[in-house]
Amino acid sequence: MGKVWSKSSLVGWPQVIDRMRRQQDPAEGVGAVSQDLANRGAITIRNTKENNQALAWLEEQKEEAVGFPVCPQVPLRPMTYKEAFDLSFFLREKGGLEGLVWSTKRQEILDLWVYHTQGIFPDWQNYTPGPGVRYPLTFGWCFKLVPLSPEEVEEANQGDNNVLLHPMCQHGMEDPDKEVLVWRFDSSLARVHRARELHPEFYQNC
């Protein structure tokens, strides 16, 4: 039996076992491609740019100038609870996201940056529907989207320095409920999966 597995057969095994130990399940709430990456180690033919919105969107980004390379610098992987948790606290510490007005383009830039630097497939940043507070579907991501009151929007729009195309000046045009949303950090989201409590139907196939 010892002849079958010689010393030469063990080349690379330390790296393999290290990868196995570091393997984590995807965070609850990630998309179908991330589930593929976690369960099968690759994107399968079940998910294509024809039937998966995230894949189609990512393909489009490769053809546009977004300010930094789109291809990931590290192996492609799904968002895990720990990754989402660590990213949340990293962004909170560095600043910039807290209180920033949400827009589709800004969310896409964040998704692409995480994809490029960490190799995390961009189907993890999704939120519960409105109106009202939108909670992250991915457990571990501690930023929710909070609507501003009409008074807060008007106050922010006062002055001569406002840019007409700034998300604040769009009065929620991108949001189905016409609300101006901002990212807000909420550490309780690391302990309580509010999205699953409010919308268990979103997790039936997870």
Swiss-Prot record:
The record marks W57, L58 as: Cleavage. GO terms for biological process: symbiont-mediated suppression of host antigen processing and presentation of peptide antigen via MHC class I; symbiont-mediated suppression of host antigen processing and presentation of peptide antigen via MHC class II; symbiont-mediated suppression of host autophagy. The keyword Lipoprotein applies. The record marks M20 as: Might play a role in AP-1 recruitment to the Nef-MHC-I complex. A motif (PxxP) lies at residues 72-75. Its main location: host cell. Monomer; cytosolic form. Homodimer; membrane bound form. Interacts with Nef associated p21-activated kinase (PAK2); this interaction activates PAK2. Associates with the Nef-MHC-I-AP1 complex; this complex is required for MHC-I internalization. Interacts (via C-terminus) with host PI3-kinase. Interacts with host PACS1; this interaction seems to be weak. Interacts with host PACS2. Interacts with host LCK and MAPK3; these interactions inhibit the kinase activity of the latter. Interacts with host ATP6V1H; this interaction may play a role in CD4 endocytosis. Induction: Expressed early in the viral replication cycle. HIV-1 lineages are divided in three main groups, M (for Major), O (for Outlier), and N (for New, or Non-M, Non-O). The vast majority of strains found worldwide belong to the group M. Group O seems to be endemic to and largely confined to Cameroon and neighboring countries in West Central Africa, where these viruses represent a small minority of HIV-1 strains. The group N is represented by a limited number of isolates from Cameroonian persons. The group M is further subdivided in 9 clades or subtypes (A to D, F to H, J and K). Factor of infectivity and pathogenicity, required for optimal virus replication. Alters numerous pathways of T-lymphocyte function and down-regulates immunity surface molecules in order to evade host defense and increase viral infectivity. Alters the functionality of other immunity cells, like dendritic cells, monocytes/macrophages and NK cells. The gene is nef. The modification Phosphoserine is found at S6. A motif (Dileucine internalization motif) lies at residues 164-165. Belongs to the lentivirus primate group Nef protein family. A lipid is attached at G2 (N-myristoyl glycine). The virion-associated Nef proteins are cleaved by the viral protease to release the soluble C-terminal core protein. Nef is probably cleaved concomitantly with viral structural proteins on maturation of virus particles. This is Protein Nef. GO terms for molecular function: GTP binding; SH3 domain binding.
